[in-house]
Amino acid sequence: MAIDENKQKALAAALGQIEKQFGKGSIMRLGEDRSMDVETISTGSLSLDIALGAGGLPMGRIVEIYGPESSGKTTLTLQVIAAAQREVKTCAFIDAEHALDPIYAKKLGVDIDNLLCSQPDTGEQALEICDALTRSGAVDVIIVDSVAALTPKAEIEGEIGDSHMGLAARMMSQAMRKLAGNLKNANTLLIFINQIRMKIGVMFGNPETTTGGNALKFYASVRLDIRRIGSVKEGDVVVGSETRVKVVKNKVAAPFKQAEFQIMYGEGINIRGELVDLGVKHKLIEKAGAWYSYNGEKIGQGKANACSFLKDHPEVAAELDKKLRDMLLHSAEGNSLVSDVESEDEGASESNEEF
């Protein structure tokens, strides 16, 4: 569409003035924006990366992961840290719950010697630390565990039983306004872990809500609802959890997808089990009876032995992972891998200010 010559000159002058005053790149045509292709970090789960559409969690954005107790929230974030560290990225863990287990983190592949960790006294201190790390431009991934544990200073200094209506919500709202722009400029991923509460007096719809007010819901580019849906057993011994993650909000790809995977105790996400299942589903791995074969070579009798083969041959696992990602990401076939989530399952869609 042609623009009037006088308007073009006026626009060019205005753009020149803006760039002179605020710096080059402060305004541009959208097609010229080099940051349109979103950089991502793997979640540690192939099926969840596919459900997210972009191949993982987006850098420069805010992400919220919420769910019931012992559902795998912290485990999932530690897997994200391990994946980021494998790409030589700097990570920080803001442990507001004072419950991070370094031994468990190390078992999941986290390099604890190079993981920055803070155990703040107040919510304001935790969020200020987040902002300082972000503005440094040197930290790539920040985890806050958890929003519910970000206690305002006034509440800590007050008496038990005092009313502090909306304090946490106001604190989070102010922090989101300040952090969002800094995260984008620094290309830092900020993940908030959140807990679930029940709304009183709800007769219809979902009574669940998350803590910390509504601001986090609006500013988050991705919201993940994680639930434990069953147990993984070896004989009578429970060795892990069957886990389902629903993508209830997604600003970088299609939302309302879900993924299921196993979290093994002491090991984390069973990525090799995912590779076997997805490989069979998409005909990269052949299954004849109980035998699994890859590229015409038998890799094991039974899923457990096939997983052991992939563990002993990481180059084969990496090759299979690459083939599946190339095949499924950004494709209709990939979208069919995960199912849509009903809108009523958006869960924790509203927050009460008092939480």
Swiss-Prot record:
Pfam families assigned to the protein according to its UniProt record, in alphabetical order: RecA, RecA_C
Which keywords does UniProt give here? ATP-binding, Cytoplasm, DNA damage, DNA recombination, DNA repair, DNA-binding, Nucleotide-binding, SOS response
Any coiled-coil ranges, and where?
A: none
Q: Which CDD domains match?
A: RecA
What GO terms are given for molecular function?
ATP binding; ATP hydrolysis activity; ATP-dependent DNA damage sensor activity; damaged DNA binding; single-stranded DNA binding
InterPro entries assigned = AAA+_ATPase (IPR003593), DNA_recomb/repair_RecA (IPR013765), DNA_recomb/repair_RecA_CS (IPR020584), P-loop_NTPase (IPR027417), RecA-like_C (IPR049261), RecA-like_N (IPR049428), RecA_ATP-bd (IPR020588), RecA_C_sf (IPR023400)
Is the rRNA-binding keyword given for this protein? Answer: no
Q: Where is this region: Disordered?
A: 335-355
Which BP terms from GO are recorded?
DNA recombination; DNA repair; SOS response
| Keyword check for Ribonucleoprotein | no
The GO cellular component terms are: cytosol
Q: Acidic residues bias: where? A: 341-355
Q: Where does ATP bind?
A: 67-74
Q: Out of the domains of life, which is the source?
A: Bacteria
The record's subcellular locations are: Cytoplasm
Query: What family does the Swiss-Prot or TrEMBL record give for this protein?
Result: Belongs to the RecA family.
Q: What does this protein do?
A: Can catalyze the hydrolysis of ATP in the presence of single-stranded DNA, the ATP-dependent uptake of single-stranded DNA by duplex DNA, and the ATP-dependent hybridization of homologous single-stranded DNAs. It interacts with LexA causing its activation and leading to its autocatalytic cleavage.
User: What name does the UniProt record give this protein?
Assistant: Protein RecA
Task: List the source organism.
Answer: Sodalis glossinidius
Its organism's taxonomic lineage begins at: Bacteria, Pseudomonadati, Pseudomonadota, Gammaproteobacteria, Enterobacterales
